[in-house]
């Protein structure tokens, strides 16, 4: 998810006009309340985009967290200007002394997850000068990217705007995940949520090239019943994955992952036995197993959040790409290599291993927030989420079947087109999916990687109560 999406690019004159307006309004407030302290609050963002629908929502969340602080200072007046193209501005007039309010604002800035994205300007009528952070005993503001002095980095131009936007998006994603609470659930509740992910995915229709109740897609060796049999056969494995995480002691999480991997090897045999040798859920055995184990580990002592679960996943799978796909660890015989290994050699695409190392960011940062925002019935919400995922990943299953990594760009185009015509909410969008399904069947294409990511998304959505 890009939090700057939908924002208007400003020119220099618009920025300067807003700065002049703010200074003038601050002076008016100081003249009206000569003994009070004036604090202006706005987003502190680099570049020409200062607001967007998503940034507006984030700003309001921060203000909700900041409001109790100002209430403790006794609010005399509050003025909000939230719909400006230069970004929302809020002014608080409070009692108290300038030094104290400034210290409180800096403390909030440094303690809040998004405090660094705020511009908190504190002043009063009788102050001789603005108080600096250093005069109040605080270190200079640090750069978001490298941790060095922020003023130095700005002056020297040490970082690109793209790097700045990327870091801010990362901060906002982490903040959203910290707010998504996963309660402590029973083993059966977590396992049932995982099974729901697999069963909802195969029940969803129409899905380009994938198996659903009315079509085998591009898979001649499987039906919806094959997937149901496979899902049920994996239930004991999901229970074992939960027990591994729930009972594991200590912080050597790669060892916990090793235990899970051994269980996964046994689970694959159970899957093949149930499907007469057909690979229905090999990807889910890997990724869903990791997620179930991580949830069980993170909730051993009580509730947790998605940010913590993502950290557990990354710690479990640290150096996985290097360990599995490094030059000295790859199988030399091409016949013995997996599709993922061959694609890493040919295209340098790390696939699901790379996603796991990063804590499944496509699911955590894109798919789950997107699903939570969707309206309509369950089928519509999940179809839209599937196509959102498909347009934002390098689907190794799709690449394998296409024989060329350029298929990813085609998939991006198809995803954009789908949403431009209204997505699953419109007859045109559904017709587009059906036509795409027929084209995929004809070309023997299937987006199995997107399907696996949807399973994970459904699983987490059930846990956080969004589905």
Swiss-Prot record:
The gene is citXG. Residues 179-467 are annotated as: 2-(5''-triphosphoribosyl)-3'-dephosphocoenzyme-A synthase. This is Protein CitXG. The keyword Transmembrane helix does not apply. Its EC number is 2.7.7.61, 2.4.2.52. InterPro entries: CitG (IPR002736), CitX (IPR005551), TriPribosyl-deP-CoA_syn_CitG (IPR017551). The keyword Zinc-finger does not apply. Keywords: ATP-binding, Multifunctional enzyme, Nucleotide-binding, Nucleotidyltransferase, Transferase. It holds the Pfam family CitG. In the N-terminal section; belongs to the CitX family. Residues 1-178 are annotated as: Apo-citrate lyase phosphoribosyl-dephospho-CoA transferase.
């Amino acid at each position: 998810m890009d939090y700057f999406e939908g924002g208007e690019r400003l020119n220099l004159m618009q920025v300067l006009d807003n700065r002049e307006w703010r200074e003038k309004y601050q002076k008016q407030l100081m003249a009206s309340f000569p003994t009070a302290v004036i604090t202006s609050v706005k987003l502190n963002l680099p570049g020409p985009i200062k607001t967007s629908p998503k940034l507006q929502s984030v700003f309001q969340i921060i203000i909700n967290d900041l409001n109790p602080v100002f209430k403790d200072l006794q609010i005399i007046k509050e003025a909000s200007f939230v719909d400006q193209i230069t970004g929302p501005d809020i002014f608080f007039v409070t009692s108290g002394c300038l030094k104290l309010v400034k210290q409180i604002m800096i403390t909030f800035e440094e303690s809040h997850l998004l405090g660094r994205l705020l511009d908190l300007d504190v002043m009063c009528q009788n102050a001789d000068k603005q108080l600096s952070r250093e005069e109040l005993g605080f270190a200079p503001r640090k750069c978001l990217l490298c941790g060095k002095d922020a003023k130095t980095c700005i002056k020297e131009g040490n970082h690109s705007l793209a790097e700045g936007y990327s870091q801010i998006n990362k901060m906002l994603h982490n903040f959203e995940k910290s707010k998504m609470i996963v309660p402590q659930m029973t083993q059966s509740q977590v396992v049932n949520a995982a099974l729901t992910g697999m069963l909802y995915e195969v029940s969803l229709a129409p899905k380009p090239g994938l198996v659903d109740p009315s079509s085998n897609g591009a898979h001649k060796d499987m039906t919806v019943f094959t997937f149901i049999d496979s899902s049920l056969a994996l239930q004991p494995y999901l229970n074992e994955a939960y027990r591994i995480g729930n009972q594991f002691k200590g912080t050597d999480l790669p060892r916990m992952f090793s235990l899970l991997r051994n269980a996964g090897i046994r689970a694959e045999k159970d899957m093949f036995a149930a499907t007469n040798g057909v690979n229905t859920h090999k990807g889910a055995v890997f990724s869903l197993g990791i997620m179930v184990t991580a949830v069980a580990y993170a909730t051993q002592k009580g509730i947790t959040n998605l940010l913590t679960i993502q950290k557990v996943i990354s710690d479990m799978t640290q150096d996985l790409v290097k360990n599995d796909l490094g030059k000295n660890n790859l199988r030399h015989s091409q016949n013995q290599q997996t599709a993922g290994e061959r694609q890493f050699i040919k295209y340098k695409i790390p696939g699901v291993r790379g996603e796991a190392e990063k804590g499944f960011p496509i699911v955590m940062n894109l798919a789950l927030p997107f699903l939570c925002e969707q309206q309509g019935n369950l089928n519509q919400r999940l179809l839209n989420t599937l196509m959102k995922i498909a347009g934002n990943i390098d689907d190794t299953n799709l690449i394998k079947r296409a024989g060329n990594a350029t298929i990813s760009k085609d998939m991006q185009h198809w995803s954009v087109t789908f949403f431009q015509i209204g997505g699953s909410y419109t007859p045109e969008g559904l017709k587009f999916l059906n036509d795409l399904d027929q084209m995929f069947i004809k070309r023997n294409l299937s987006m199995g990687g997107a399907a696996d990511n949807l399973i994970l998304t459904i699983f987490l959505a059930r846990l956080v109560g969004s589905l």
